[in-house]
Swiss-Prot record:
Cysteines joined through disulfide linkages: none
Places the protein is found: Cytoplasm
Family annotation (CDD domains): AdoMet_MTases
NCBIfam families: ksgA (TIGR00755)
Binding site for S-adenosyl-L-methionine: 28, 30, 55, 77, 103, 123
Function per UniProt: Specifically dimethylates two adjacent adenosines (A1518 and A1519) in the loop of a conserved hairpin near the 3'-end of 16S rRNA in the 30S particle. May play a critical role in biogenesis of 30S subunits.
Top-level class of the enzyme under EC nomenclature: transferase
GO molecular-function terms, A-Z: 16S rRNA (adenine(1518)-N(6)/adenine(1519)-N(6))-dimethyltransferase activity; RNA binding
SMART domains given in the database record: rADc (SM00650)
Protein name: Ribosomal RNA small subunit methyltransferase A
């Protein structure tokens, strides 16, 4: 397939630079520039926007983002084999592509983004996608540095991101954290045949838009409560929350929740209430029923 941006076809780039995907890095490359273009367009108009991309590999999505008009792309890549291929793209789009040789799990892109409008668009490596997302949702400061994220995950992870109590099998800590701070939706699925090598499962592209004003809650408190609650999801909350406090029953009563309730039955607002009450309870002298 010839590319419409004047750069060589991706298969040729991969062959020339010896970029066969590595399973250890969670790499599955997209060669179809029509598909990468669709992903880039899902992030909306990109004029004037800085896009942060994780795991660009040979640069198929990178090229699509630049072709769709992104003012600047910050591409974070830990595989040194990909750097020469990305350098070729940077030369083709002078001043618009900054390649960072780093592990995205340990790298903070905010100093490079600055005050410019920013989005995250990425075909995330399967082995670190969830960890990256929870990191972007973390922190007490909100709204975050990004105004939208368009991300590729395994379908089962995507379903967990958008799940609520009505989808009990998929609903968990990830769904609570995403539902608390973002509006999340699955945009479309991507067949395994679109990737090289083809994974064993279908993938999905998810869009997350930060809520301007999430329900007030300390992020660390919500993380602690959901970790305890879903860590033993089949147990009643009065048992699973004892990992946090011996007063779990009083905490549930103060929140108006049944002691026999299980984590998968509690909506996001219920977990926020629990987290606020637990946060108050852990402060010296604060009664269980007092919100933080």
């Amino acid at each position: 397939m010839s590319a419409g941006d004047g750069l060589p076809p991706l298969r040729e780039v991969v062959a020339r630079h010896g970029l066969e995907p590595k399973k250890a890095l969670g790499q599955n490359f997209l060669y179809d520039l029509n598909l990468t273009g669709r992903i880039a367009r899902a992030a909306g108009p990109l004029a004037g926007v800085t896009v942060v991309e994780v795991g660009p590999g040979p640069g198929g999505l990178t090229r699509a983002l630049l072709a769709e008009g992104a003012a600047r792309v910050v591409a974070i890549e830990r595989d040194p084999r990909a750097l020469p291929a990305l350098a070729e793209i940077a030369a083709h789009y002078p001043g618009r592509l900054e390649v960072v040789d780093a592990d995205a799990l340990a790298f903070d892109p905010r100093p490079l983004v600055g005050d410019a409008p920013a989005r995250i668009v990425a075909n995330l490596p399967y082995n670190v996608g969830t960890a990256l997302l929870t990191g972007w949702l973390d922190g007490e400061a909100w709204p975050p540095w990004w105004d939208q994220a368009v991300l590729m995950f395994q379908r089962e992870v995507a379903e967990r991101i958008v799940a609520g109590p009505e989808e009990r099998a998929d609903y968990g800590r990830l769904g609570v954290l995403c539902g608390w701070r973002t509006e999340a939706e699955i945009l479309f699925d991507v067949s395994p045949s679109a990737f090289v090598p083809p994974p064993k499962v279908t993938s999905s592209v998810v869009r997350l838009v930060p809520r301007a004003q999430p329900l007030p809650c300390r992020a660390g408190a919500l993380e602690a409560v959901t970790r305890a609650a879903f860590g033993q999801r089949r147990k009643m909350l009065r048992q699973s929350l004892k990992a946090l406090t011996p007063a779990a029953g009083d905490l549930l009563a103060a929140a108006g929740l049944s002691e026999t309730a299980r984590a998968e039955e509690i909506p996001v607002a219920g977990f926020v209430d629990l987290a606020n009450r637990w946060d108050a309870h852990r402060k010296a002298g604060a009664p269980v029923g007092t919100p933080a």
